[in-house]
């Protein structure tokens, strides 16, 4: 059984990470709600926190821990406000709406079937 920092991670980051471990050479098409879109391959996954981003300590009520997935970007389909160039990090705070395997056409993640988004 997995331990999640946030309940939605089960249906988002962990679902995608598990797929990437099963299909390590998959090239994924990663789309965000605002039209921003990338293609890339799984690079890494790790637990992270926002203390450095906000320059805060663990006892600050804004402090948050979460699991992140990192993709090496092979193609920028549609650029947007995130401005990623080489690596794309995703976590529950700004998760894509659709992730598909471009080789198999399989939907790896869809916000439409994510129970944490309904």
Which residue ranges define each predicted feature?
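Conserved RNA-binding domains used in RNP assembly and mRNA/RNA metabolism
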Residues: 2-118
């Amino acid at each position: 059984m997995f331990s999640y920092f946030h309940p939605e991670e089960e249906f988002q980051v962990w679902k995608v990470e598990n797929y990437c471990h099963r299909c390590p050479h998959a090239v994924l098409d990663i789309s965000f709600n605002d039209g921003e879109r990338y293609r890339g391959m799984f690079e890494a996954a790790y637990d992270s926190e926002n203390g450095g981003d906000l320059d805060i300590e663990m006892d600050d009520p804004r402090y948050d821990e979460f699991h992140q997935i990192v993709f090496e970007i092979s193609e920028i389909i549609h650029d947007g406000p995130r401005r990623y160039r080489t690596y794309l990090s995703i976590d529950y705070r700004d998760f894509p709406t659709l992730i598909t395997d471009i080789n198999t056409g399989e939907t790896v993640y869809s916000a439409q079937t994510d129970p944490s988004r309904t």
